[in-house]
Amino acid sequence: MKTVFAILFLTFIAFTYAKSYEDVKEEIKNEVEREIFEDLEEESDVLDSNVRELNDAKPWRFRRAIRSIRWRKVGPYVPIIVKMAGKK
């Protein structure tokens, strides 16, 4: 919501000080591009920090490996695997 209000405020300022429609259009385009680039930089910083956390050497690797399994996808196959293992 803050970015929306910032864009609207900057648009109002552009309309106030602009000399023509083209100036207003160019100003809005520049402000929107600037906001998009700032958001992308913030997201890339968050992604970089997540990558660093995942690459850290931590104990309990086996436990983390089990946690990372998507049980909703694997769950329906568990009874079949148990049945096959019991047959010999």
Curated annotation (Swiss-Prot):
It comes from the Eukaryota. Expressed in entodermal epithelium along the body column. The modification Alanine amide is found at A85. Coiled coil: none annotated. Residues 19-57 form a propeptide. Residues 1-18 form the signal peptide. Belongs to the arminin family. This is Arminin 7965.
